Amino acid sequence: MSDEKSKATLLKEEIMMKGSKGAATLNAEEIKKADDFCVGYKKFLDHSPVEREAVSYTLELAKKAGFTEYDENASYNAGDKVYYVNRDKAIALAVIGKNGVKNGARLAIAHIDSPRIDLKPNPLYEDTNLALFKTHYYGGLKKYQWTALPLSLHGTVVKLDGTKVNITWGDDENESCFCVTDLLPHLAKDQVSKPLAKVFTGEDLNVLVGSRPYEDGNDEKDLVKLNVMAILNKKYGIVEGDFLSAELCLIPSFKTRDIGFDASMIGGYGHDDKVCAYPAVMASLDVETPEQTCVTYLTDKEETGSDGNTGMQSDFLRYFIYDLAKQDGIDGYKALSKSTCLSADVSAAYDPTYASAYEAKNSCYINEGVVISKYTGHGGKYDTSDASAEYMGKVRALLEKNNVMWQVGELGKVDMGGGGTIAKYVANMNVDVVDLGVPVLCMHAPFEIVSKIDVYMAYRAFFAFFDDKI
């Protein structure tokens, strides 16, 4: 048999895509780098379950790396590193480039909020000798996934005198936690006959927080509620009225864990979108003197539409770029118009158990690198930014040049559902933008799963974006 390749084989090698670039193509050294990188990521995830804590932890990392607080009246030089915090719930990290923002900035934008259960403004009540919290769920979650689950309380309370109190209760395995109760199967005939979306309503997500009455209560009412409030008062110095000026939420109380016999994956709460936030932050910390100013921005409120003054629809980032442009002697809108952005957000990894929800040829897969999504939205490409072919080509070439493992993918089958990212709000500022992130299994569940290799490739992608010329 001849060893010469046929014309068809040669043509195929020249013009056809090569297929998967999965984990099998990486050597042991690269896999170890991925595993080592994820040690820091797992710590970040455990310390950053809610946006205020994510900002605090990011700020700690940034200061250790030499970042200083941004001063609009200061003069900055290439290589200077600054941070800019928005109301303790969003943060920008900027590394000043050799050309500043004269030719635009490089933006990597991730969000640090995740689906959770928020407390209502007046949450604490007692019913049949049980103390409970009334809640209002946040973001697109499946309510049934949050029942019969150990929960922790996180957040901030501002007292009447203006004192700010940070609360964390339930993370330590030796500390008590909280729970949304569920109905036993023996009495669930009516419950299980309902459509899944109607099994639990928002008003059913009441959180059990106590059952013992306050001692020496005599004939007073609501002694269990009083006892809970007395415990909170003793530990934090707060009174019931302080709930009215508080941001408190309940999140899963379990820690991040490796998944699989091979420990190749990570399970935990809040991968969406901290699995993109952390690699982008680390890229900012590691880049030294880029050509263009590089900005990693961690924003809030993405899960509920990016509204509010800490969400992507606020003008905080726009004004920051304007201030940087002012120092360079150009108009802010011109700097933005020349900027490029990676919208650092996750996508839904193909799950063979639920294959009917995906279109296999245009899905992303675990262990095949970062995923580029040209558009998200729903139906006929509604509510999305659709990245241009030109910008897709530039990002594709950048990743290939820097040997970053990558893939493309859509969010499931057309008309199956859909979702959105902050990309459309960035595009509205006349910035070229495309979504680039990590594939996730069990997205929006209390326990999401990602690949360590994909997390590391996200870091490689963001670093290349900051450090290389496009």
Which residues does each PLM region occupy?
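N-terminal hydrophobic/helix-forming segments and targeting peptides
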Residues: M1-I470
